[in-house]
């Protein structure tokens, strides 16, 4: 499994059998380094409806004739915008060709702004993505919560992607504890340095992970790892 980071919380996951993008905030993200026009995937996965996660999902799904996986209300919004969708909800699992997707809790909010109107986009979520026997946990935007320990106990996670930006999500201290609870030996930090209010030192965070026996990957946009 190859995982490429495109800034903020966007990850492209590739195996021989499938390609998936999660939270494709690309065209509006100064740190993405890629255009949504260049994305070729079999599915789009969304953690919640905020613009820095919904991003270019509808465009990417339409140009690839592939579905968007999202919590029910957000999936319906994407469907009304013309995309194919898979309606998910917290705790549910779906197998789609070579991809297995399970939605978990996240403690955050989820909405979409259109003009002066805010649209409810269902509950925020984390995502367990399994392809070819490898499992990635994308925590989405979340605070630290104790059931992360349960997720780690019930699922063999090969790689966890965790927000560290603070202010809008958990910060580095809480993310370090989340990594321990998830029992993942590899972690990618997400959701930092896109805006001044979420500036963090990812190298320092990964150094702290290393002291816990966890390998951290402070990827720059366009950089990849393989697991």
Stretch-by-stretch model annotation:
Residues 12-50, 55-59, 109-119, 142-154:
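Pre-active-site segment of Zn-dependent metallo-hydrolases
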Residues 1-19, 26-29, 95, 102-104, ...:
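Zn-dependent metallo-beta-lactamase
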Residues 21-24, 41-49, 69-72, 137-142, ...:
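Active-site neighborhood of phospho(di)ester-bond hydrolases with catalytic His/Asp-centered motifs
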Residues 32-110:
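Active-site HxH/HxHxD metal-binding segment of metal-dependent hydrolases
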Residues 67, 79-92, 176, 180-227:
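Binuclear metal-ion centers of metallo-dependent hydrolases, dominated by the metallo-beta-lactamase
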């Amino acid at each position: 499994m190859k995982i490429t980071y495109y800034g903020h919380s966007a990850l492209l996951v590739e195996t021989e059998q499938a390609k998936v993008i999660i939270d494709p905030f690309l065209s509006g993200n100064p740190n993405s380094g890629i255009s949504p026009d260049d994305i070729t995937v079999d599915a789009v996965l969304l953690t919640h409806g905020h613009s820095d996660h919904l991003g270019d999902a509808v465009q990417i799904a339409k140009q690839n004739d592939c579905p968007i996986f999202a919590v029910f209300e957000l999936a319906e919004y994407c469907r009304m915008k013309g995309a194919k969708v898979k309606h998910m909800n917290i705790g549910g699992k779906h197998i789609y060709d070579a991809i297995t997707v399970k939605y978990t809790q996240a403690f955050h909010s989820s909405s979409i702004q259109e003009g002066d109107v805010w649209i409810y986009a269902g509950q925020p979520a984390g995502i367990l993505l399994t392809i070819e026997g490898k499992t990635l946990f994308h925590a989405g935007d979340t605070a630290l919560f104790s059931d992360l320990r349960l997720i780690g106990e019930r699922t063999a996670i090969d790689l966890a992607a965790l927000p560290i930006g603070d202010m809008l999500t958990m910060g580095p201290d809480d993310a370090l504890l989340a990594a321990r609870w998830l029992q993942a030996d590899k972690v990618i930090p997400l959701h930092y340095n896109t805006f001044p209010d979420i500036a963090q030192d990812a190298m320092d965070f990964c150094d702290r992970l290393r002291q816990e026996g966890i390998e951290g990957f402070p990827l720059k946009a366009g950089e990849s790892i393989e697991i």
